[in-house]
């Protein structure tokens, strides 16, 4: 039993069958018993590129290595006849590289060997120290899929054999090599890992995709990889909008060769890389469903605020240099999505950028966190949406009105009686008025020592209960002591000394209290 292997020439960009090429491999029936050829003989009825077992994944590459470096490494190991597909950073949709950022690889590549036997022998060198690089070891594994060209795009294979998942909440420092190794160590059918990068800055947008060739392992990954930590952050996984859609580009997912040439697909949607592109006749369904690209895992949501509100699309930029203008700020954040407005308050050293959708805002926060703008590293967070701001202002106004209503107004003092006018002279008590009588007394006799010729009494009265009253003060109260009626005083309570009358006020007060009087002497 023998097979002719299809050989891929990157320079030509198509598949040809070359019986005389050095890649032509004849697998005898004796090889069928070799353990090194098991993968190459599995599914022998559908032999094609990437399934013949002649391709290896090579990871843990130095960022500065290129194809020539990898070729030299394998040449020193006795494998000179290889083809290397290097995965580069900052690759744009048209296949060219971005001018921003250094030319670094993504930490891994794919190596094609002349036959599965060569690939199996090379795999035995896994963990070996790399010649001329004493601090590096070979990190090898089987690659279960190939690529269609040297520009880092995936080969258009049957959609039924490819299943992909969405991976979100990636740390900014996660590389595609780390993401691929996370899944390949658990699921052997992992074929490719893709992290979406910004076309201008080259920074990760915080999400990507992992492709499998086995749908069962894809379903296992959806259930087992939820919340797995990668570089200190728990990742989120979810299915894509359709299991028949797959990645067709390296950065923000390039247009597939034939399915998008004749279709006017929304360029803003393509720039976000939010869905895998379809093949064949699935273009119309792709355009109808591009508004719901991903199915995120259902989780219990906390109470809504400007951090968790799904309708909030405003990004707060702190630590902003005062030299940055709104147009410059817009240029930095434009690659993440369509911007509604950009605002930089005067003298606040901060700014606000509002996007059309929340996914763009999330990508901006993940991609621009700590990014230097005008020699100042910015810090990003969620800003308040217009709805939240309006509700906050309304709540503050309502609270202020409620506080004003609760504060009592200034009130005039309330009296239990009507105060007499200060200009009116006091009126002497009337013996006939019973309301003036004290409890326990039936009749109170009042004497007026100040009666004048017309029979009217003087209104100038002063009542003293001071024990220290002088004789002069006591005498001043009595106009004519000889005419006073002292019969009610008991004799011993008023001491007459010539023209002066001294009132023994203490004894008089005590006696009158015992008799039910008010304790004062009325003269």
Curated annotation (Swiss-Prot):
One of its GO terms (molecular function) is mRNA binding. It comes from the Eukaryota. It holds the Pfam family RRM_1. Residues 240-260 have a biased composition (Polar residues). Residues 54-145, 163-242, 313-385 form the RRM domain. Disruption phenotype: Affects the meiotic recombination and the formation of viable spores. Keywords: mRNA processing, mRNA splicing, Repeat, RNA-binding, Spliceosome. SUPFAM superfamilies: RNA-binding domain, RBD. GO terms for biological process: mRNA 5'-splice site recognition; mRNA splice site recognition; mRNA splicing, via spliceosome; positive regulation of mRNA splicing, via spliceosome. Residues 1-35, 239-260 are annotated as: Disordered. GO terms for cellular component: commitment complex; cytoplasm; cytosol; nucleus; spliceosomal complex; U1 snRNP; U2-type prespliceosome. Component of the U1 small nuclear ribonucleoprotein complex (U1 snRNP) involved in the initiation of meiotic recombination. Involved in the formation of DSBs at recombination hot-spots through meiosis-specific splicing of REC107 pre-mRNA. Collaborates with MER1 to promote splicing of essential meiotic mRNAs REC10, AMA1, MER3, HFM1, SPO22 and PCH2. NAM8 interacts with the pre-mRNA downstream of the 5' splice site, in a region of non-conserved sequence and is required for efficient splicing of uncapped RNA precursor. This is Protein NAM8.
